Amino acid sequence: MLTDNVQKESMDKKQKISVVINTYNAERHLKRVLQSVKGFDEIVVCDMESTDTTLDIAREWGCKVVTFQKKNYTIVEPARQFAIDSATNEWVLVVDADELVTDELREELYNSISKADCAAGILIPRRNYFMGRLYDYPDYQLRFLKKEGCHWPPTIHSRPTVNGPTRRLPAKRKELAFIHLADDTISLRLKKLNTYTDNEVKKRIGKRYTTFDLIMKPLWRTLRRYFFKGGIGNGAAGMINAVLDGLYKFITIAKIMEEEERKNDIR
């Protein structure tokens, strides 16, 4: 009888999904985010010692709350693995504290895990706001995964690895995309750019770039974002977003080159 109960519990976990949300002072959008994921089996909020009402909101919604010490971290990635490990169920959906999950996406994920050939990871398209406009073209995030064998590196903009194949949801089905609510002003984008590129330098220790790279890599990133990733269809906002994306690459490479030059300073 005990063995039967253990097997039943194991099967139940295989058919359930835990939502994991990493937070730090995330009160602005958190209620809407939690409303959008209320149809899942478990919601885990992994908080990095917020000083606003984030924890109050999470507890009010009945979330499982765990704490990851913030220390000097300025990015979320160091807390990702801990958050995933805190989930009860075998399948985990990682949601940022400014992203909405549609009913259609939830249904798609439950349908997926009911099939024997379900991929170990699913890349989900994400539609982003910028300058008050919701972009139709998405970026992809590997956010739905099987917990067993998953590893999320602690470096900025890292992607998890999973134990098995992955697949992408079709971008043309807009109803399956995350809705990214963050509509950062250009000033805030530039402020974040400085923080994020500092972390990019740490991630790329030992990487070497040439002056050619400094020119061509940011240029290609801008052109790709504008012409091949749909920016051209979004007017001035599309051009501004593409240039900011290229600037991110330029500042990253410039800081890495600066770091190398300073190592050679013999003063």
Task: List where the protein language model places each region.
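Conserved donor nucleotide-binding strand/loop of the catalytic core
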Residues: 55-86
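Acidic helix N-cap motif at the loop->helix transition within catalytic regions
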Residues: 28-31, 52-61, 104-105
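Catalytic-site signature of metal-activated, phosphate-bearing donor transferases
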Residues: 77-78, 84, 95, 102-263
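Catalytic phosphate/metal-binding cores of nucleic-acid and nucleotide-processing enzymes, i.e., regions
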Residues: 21-24, 49, 70-74, 116
